[in-house]
């Protein structure tokens, strides 16, 4: 926020010509270019999931990250930075995708019907239970992170921040009614329209009803 105090969204970064550092092959980047939200020449697909470049350039670039993780890490873990970073959500800039969905092959739906009938409510209850009391699960996540030792830094403080951030930014919550885990078909259609606008390869005959169901 100190580097670009007037920036609130991706269009502001576009207008300033700020480099956007992301992983290669990101669908949202192609969609944002098609929508005019970003310019193709400002996207740098060389992000390596480390803070090194952002810190070396003193925050002159923007980069992808998790709203539930990076703000904490940059302020509390990466001592070379040690201050706030500003964020804007993909969803708020025109990419309302559902993240981390549970998917099956349509051809297997009948075969898996009995299992899904039992399993999906467990998923739903786990979301509710976690956000009512996340301490035990957070401790397990932190422990597993240490055991994997794969380069990702995730502390107890980060886990606590993540829980609060998910609620603050609406990263988790009910669907269009009072049920957690169900999907808004209008939102699915918005994504299909965005994919078509960007000219991405897809089956043009698909409708939201072909892709999601709320029956479980």
Predicted regions and their residues:
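A short alpha->loop->secondary-structure connector
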Residues: 36-44
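Secondary-structure end/capping motifs
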Residues: 111-198
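Flexible hinge/capping segments at coil-to-helix
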Residues: 2-18, 110-113
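Pocket-lining segment of extracytoplasmic ligand-binding domains
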Residues: 29, 47-149
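Active-site catalytic pocket residues across diverse enzymes, especially alpha/beta-hydrolases
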Residues: 35-36, 78
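Long, low-complexity C-terminal extensions of enzymes
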Residues: 191-192, 196-216
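Conserved PLP-enzyme active-site core in the AAT-like
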Residues: 32
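Short loop->beta-strand "edge-of-pocket" segments that line small-molecule binding or catalytic clefts
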Residues: 10-25, 61-62, 121, 125-127
């Amino acid at each position: 926020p100190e580097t670009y105090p007037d920036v609130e969204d991706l269009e502001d970064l576009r207008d300033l010509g700020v480099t956007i550092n992301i992983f290669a092959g990101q669908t949202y980047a192609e969609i944002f270019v098609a929508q005019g939200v970003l310019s193709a020449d400002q996207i740098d697909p060389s992000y390596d999931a480390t803070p090194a470049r952002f810190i070396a350039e003193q925050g002159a670039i923007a980069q992808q990250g998790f709203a539930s993780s990076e703000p904490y890490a940059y302020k509390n873990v990466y001592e070379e930075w040690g201050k706030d970073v500003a964020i804007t959500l993909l969803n708020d800039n025109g990419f309302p995708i559902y993240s981390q969905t549970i998917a099956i092959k349509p051809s297997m739906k009948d075969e898996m019907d009995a299992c899904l009938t039992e399993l999906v409510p467990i998923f739903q209850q786990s979301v509710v239970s976690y956000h009512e009391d996340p301490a035990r699960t957070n401790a397990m996540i932190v422990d597993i992170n240490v055991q994997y030792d794969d380069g990702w830094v995730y502390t107890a403080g980060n886990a606590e921040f993540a829980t609060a951030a998910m609620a603050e930014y609406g990263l988790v919550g009910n669907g269009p009614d009072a049920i957690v885990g169900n999907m808004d078909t209008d939102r699915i259609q918005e994504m299909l329209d965005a994919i078509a606008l960007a000219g991405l390869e897809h089956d043009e005959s698909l409708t939201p009803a072909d892709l999601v169901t709320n029956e479980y």
